[in-house]
Amino acid sequence: MNSAAGFSHLDRRERVLKLGESFEKQPRCAFHTVRYDFKPASIDTSSEGYLEVGEGEQVTITLPNIEGSTPPVTVFKGSKKPYLKECILIINHDTGECRLEKLSSNITVKKTRVEGSSKIQYRKEQQQQQMWNSARTPNLVKHSPSEDKMSPASPIDDIERELKAEASLMDQMSSCDSSSDSKSSSSSSSEDSSSDSEDEDCKSSTSDTGNCVSGHPTMTQYRIPDIDASHNRFRDNSGLLMNTLRNDLQLSESGSDSDD
């Protein structure tokens, strides 16, 4: 132990320092130091790891993570360099033994990310998905303006057709009004004619007005009162004429009787 805290547990009495097996001519063991650039808290310190030395002094260290972590292991890769004069002091606090061992090599490793399992890779995939979705969105928007331009055409055509139909209907209604007014004036001017001709004129005007009304159902509710009023005038005028004729006949008969 090479820290100050380790020496604090030692008392002031003298101890025997032994040289370890690494100092033998044919050492049966070797000691190495490992330096990590970053050691995650998810590593399970109670489990054993694996160290593999490959070609070119390349070193791979695999340490298990806590159960349920993603990924299940953490992998470190690096290289080793030999030590020349460095040693390590090992103190056994239970027995009080102090042993000096020779360091063989210094291993420096860096944490690697497992492809497809790390959080960074997951975030990259999410970003790629968002970029792909954003790239698709403009293509969909480009087609919408043309459809929006074409869609308002049909309501405008419908409005134009409705306006034309209303204008045509107004023309027909005005023509019917003028014809009915002319017939009403002609019927009122013929009060001095005979009752038969008045009845025929009344029938013809009634039939013509009926045709006009039947041809334009929308106008019926507006023109029926005028037709009824003119028909009533025809009846009043006809009755007045008949009374006048009867009075004339009675006067002529009374005059002839007086002459006799």
From Swiss-Prot:
A Gene Ontology molecular function term of the record: transcription elongation factor activity
Low complexity bias: start-end ranges: 174-192
Principal localisation: nucleus
Chain positions covered by the region annotation Necessary for interaction with TCEA1 and transactivation activity: 246-260
Compositional bias segments (type: Basic and acidic residues): 116-126, 225-234
Cell compartments where the protein resides: Nucleus speckle
Signal sequence interval, chain numbering: none
Entry superkingdom: Eukaryota
Upregulation: By androgen.
Tissue-specific expression: Expressed in heart, brain, placenta, lung, skeletal muscle, kidney, pancreas, spleen, prostate, testis, small intestine, colon, adrenal, bone marrow, lymph node, spinal gland, stomach, thyroid, trachea, thymus, liver and leukocytes.
Necessary for transactivation activity: annotated segments: 177-260
A GO BP annotation: positive regulation of transcription by RNA polymerase II
Residues where Phosphoserine is found: 146, 151, 154
Any one of the GO CC terms: nuclear speck
Region (Necessary for interaction with ELL): 17-104
Region Disordered: start-end pairs: 116-154, 170-234
Keywords of the record: Activator, Apoptosis, Nucleus, Phosphoprotein, Transcription, Transcription regulation
SS bonds (residue pairs): none
Subunit structure: Isoform 1 and isoform 2 interact with TCEA1. Component of the super elongation complex (SEC), at least composed of EAF1, EAF2, CDK9, MLLT3/AF9, AFF (AFF1 or AFF4), the P-TEFb complex and ELL (ELL, ELL2 or ELL3). Interacts with ELL and ELL2.
Annotated function: Acts as a transcriptional transactivator of TCEA1 elongation activity. Acts as a transcriptional transactivator of ELL and ELL2 elongation activities. Potent inducer of apoptosis in prostatic and non-prostatic cell lines. Inhibits prostate tumor growth in vivo.
UniProt similarity note: Belongs to the EAF family.
Stated name of the protein: ELL-associated factor 2
Origin species: Homo sapiens
Gene that this sequence comes from: EAF2
